Regions:
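Conserved phosphate-binding/catalytic region of the ribokinase-like
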Residues: 2, 191-232
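Residues that scaffold the ATP/ADP-binding catalytic core of kinase and kinase-like folds
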Residues: 14, 66, 90, 183, ...
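Conserved beta-alpha-beta core of the PfkB/ribokinase-like small-molecule kinase fold
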Residues: 115, 120-200, 217-219
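Structural alpha-helical scaffold elements that stabilize or flank donor/cofactor-binding regions
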Residues: 108-109, 165-166, 203
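Conserved N-terminal subdomain of the carbohydrate kinase-like
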Residues: 38-120, 141-145
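Short, conserved phosphate/pyrophosphate- and ester-handling motifs at nucleotide-, phospho-/glycolipid
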Residues: 32, 176, 213
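Glycine-rich phosphate/adenosyl-contacting loop at the front of the ribokinase-like
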Residues: 1-63, 77
């Protein structure tokens, strides 16, 4: 019961210089595997060339997958650069990772999962949202279980309900300073400093840990009663 899962979007980032595999959950699972842990990617791809190529790349990297092929196109993100070189992202909707099914195999995986990392982006659709929430609810209860919510606020693909339900189910929250400002506005406490907001979230959702990244200004790790800081 030591499997570590990255659950959510698996897609192609289509860049000006070509395409590369993207998706935070897949990236998480890959890096975990490089430390020798039993990791899995849970997602969905289409029955198309893009989907098969994702499966082939993961196989080449020896990354274990539980990826369903569904009757929707494989997800893509069109990445363009504006006049000053700032990237702009167009995340396609109605794609495979919006339709991750909850299967018997996925239920068995949930029962043997020690840690899972999930985000808000893959919950923009009702199908994948229900699957992710059901997976989290199926995992065994226990102090050793780790449920990491890596908030990923993109293109307005989130609601207060999605954020509340995700934070209620997680025990570790990873968030950046810009996302924290957005979350604070949604929940109605914008007038206090970033650290105070973190303490509020830690207590409100009974979190084991909250990780706040602040770009070039370093990172903070909050646990009940203790905060640590690391330079970038």
């Amino acid at each position: 019961m030591n499997t570590i899962v990255g659950m959510g979007e698996a897609l192609w980032d289509v860049l000006p210089e070509g395409k590369k595999i993207g998706g935070a959950p897949a990236n998480f699972a890959y890096h975990v595997s490089q430390f020798g842990f039993d990791s899995r990617v849970v997602s969905a791809v289409g029955r198309d060339a893009d989907g098969q190529e994702i499966l082939d790349v993961f196989a080449q990297k020896k990354l274990t997958c539980q990826i369903e092929q569904v009757d929707y196109p494989t997800g893509t993100v069109q990445v363009t650069l504006d006049a000053v070189g700032v990237p702009c992202y167009e995340i396609k909707e109605g794609v495979a990772w919006d339709n991750i099914p909850f299967t018997d195999d996925l239920k068995r995986l949930a029962l043997s999962t020690r840690a899972v990392c999930f985000g808000s982006l893959a919950q923009r659709s009702p199908v994948s949202r229900a699957t992710i929430q059901r997976f989290l609810d199926t995992m065994p209860d226990g102090e050793d279980q780790i449920k990491i919510f890596d908030i990923n606020l993109r293109q307005g693909f989130y609601t207060k309900e999605i954020l509340c339900e995700s934070m209620r189910r997680c025990n570790i929250l990873k968030i950046n300073d810009e996302e924290l400002v957005t979350i604070s506005r949604i929940f109605g406490y914008p007038g206090i400093d970033l650290q105070d907001k973190c303490w509020i979230l830690l207590a409100k959702y009974n979190l084991k840990m909250l990780i706040l990244t602040c770009g070039t200004n370093g990172s903070y790790v909050f646990t009940p009663g203790v905060v640590s800081y690391q330079d970038t």
